[in-house]
């Protein structure tokens, strides 16, 4: 999404922790983020993010109800 496009129904969330890499080849990062507005304001959820991401980044989420599954280990 470019900066010129409208945000529509999206909600902003700030990355507070990078949990680790996930996906078949480690192409996605799992992050914990705090919802900054809306009915779920202040709630911390886990999401999978493609591309470079670090603490303090702000994400635009289309919906805030779903959590990502935790990264499994052996």
Curated annotation (Swiss-Prot):
It comes from the Archaea. NCBIfam families: PRK04007.1 (NF003080). Keywords: Ribonucleoprotein, Ribosomal protein. One of its GO terms (biological process) is ribosomal small subunit assembly. The gene is rps28e. SUPFAM superfamilies: Nucleic acid-binding proteins. This is Small ribosomal subunit protein eS28. InterPro entries: NA-bd_OB-fold, Ribosomal_eS28. It comes from Halorubrum lacusprofundi (strain ATCC 49239 / DSM 5036 / JCM 8891 / ACAM 34).
């Amino acid at each position: 999404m470019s900066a010129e496009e409208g945000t529509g129904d999206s909600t902003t969330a700030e990355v507070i922790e990078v949990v680790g890499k996930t996906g078949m080849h480690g192409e996605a990062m799992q992050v914990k983020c705090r919802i900054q507005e809306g009915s779920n304001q202040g709630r911390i959820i886990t999401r999978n993010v493609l591309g470079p991401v670090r603490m303090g980044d702000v994400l635009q989420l289309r919906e805030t109800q779903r959590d990502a599954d935790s990264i499994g280990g052996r």
